[in-house]
Amino acid sequence: MRFLFLITPLFFSHITLAATGCIPEMNGTWSLNSYKSLDPTNLAYEVLVFSNTGEEQRYLMEFENKPNERRSLEWSVPCDGKDHPSPDFPWSTAPNATVAITRLGDKSEFVVQKENGRLTTTYTRVLADNDQTMISVGRDADNKVIWVRIFDKDK
């Protein structure tokens, strides 16, 4: 029995665990490149400003859904894969909306939004081009792609 206890860690030592925490390379200002994006809502303007810590994603979002209707919101949530109360998103008015962020790898994360415990939206964010491009692919509750947004990192 003692032999099995000693050898088991060696046997499974090759297994790699998924990255945890938030992605520090996301920190900075990201501007929507509407020419490269596929967005049926025709979002003309969106800027994300990330200031992540090791365990918490923090960002300021400025956006314009309609001409002359620019808005912003600021929020933070742990990157632990658990549901947390969601900020007052303009597109979500449910009092018990939640958001969960799970890091998938060194340069990617998965975000889940729910209202009343039911899935509403998911999106995957991936850093590319030497961390100078962020790709966001959004899906609805039926897993249908609803946007592909490309953001360029401001220098």
How should these model regions be labeled?
Residues 6-8:
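Sec-dependent N-terminal signal peptides
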Residues 1-4:
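Positively charged n-region of N-terminal signal peptides that target proteins for export
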